[in-house]
């Protein structure tokens, strides 16, 4: 199995995020835009590029549970088990914010959207970066998400600081989103 965290283009993308850059990378179904979630300017640049209001919030993806542990340290055993039952995989959970996720990540919501990805390139990017990464579909608002590198370039051309290697997964729809407290499906897959 390939360790994508060692891929030169994945490493370059991780380095660009460390420097405040906005990048594109493949996910389970579509290409995503990403950046360092703790860099407010980088998130603002990503949202401006996408023409997405900050109030909508963004998803954080991680390579493993340890990378998002600080965001879930307040959960009880049953809630943690619910997460573990679906991760790694294409389910994003809305987890009550324990105060660690900044407003430019949560938007107007009291929760943070988290997913441990099972996409090998996206997980490799998180490992190369050393933590969770912002994940939102790679498209301007109102356009369909990019499903390949050609669509990424058509939408954003030279506006991105890096474009990762890899291909989007075979899923036809973006990840399902569920509310951890209610179990309700907020966005079906």
Curated annotation (Swiss-Prot):
Pfam family, one: Sua5_yciO_yrdC
EC number: 2.7.7.87
Entry keywords, A to Z: ATP-binding, Cytoplasm, Nucleotide-binding, Nucleotidyltransferase, Transferase, tRNA processing
MF terms in GO: ATP binding; double-stranded RNA binding; L-threonylcarbamoyladenylate synthase; tRNA binding
Cellular component, GO annotation: cytoplasm
Subcellular location(s) of the protein: Cytoplasm
BP terms from Gene Ontology: regulation of translational fidelity; tRNA threonylcarbamoyladenosine modification
Domain YrdC-like: 7-189
Keyword tRNA processing: yes
InterPro entries in the cross-refs: DHBP_synth_RibB-like_a/b_dom, Sua5-like_dom, TC-AMP_synthase, TC-AMP_synthase_SUA5
HAMAP family: TsaC
Protein purpose: Required for the formation of a threonylcarbamoyl group on adenosine at position 37 (t(6)A37) in tRNAs that read codons beginning with adenine. Catalyzes the conversion of L-threonine, HCO(3)(-)/CO(2) and ATP to give threonylcarbamoyl-AMP (TC-AMP) as the acyladenylate intermediate, with the release of diphosphate.
Protein name in UniProt: Threonylcarbamoyl-AMP synthase
Natural source organism: Cellvibrio japonicus (strain Ueda107)
Gene (name only): tsaC
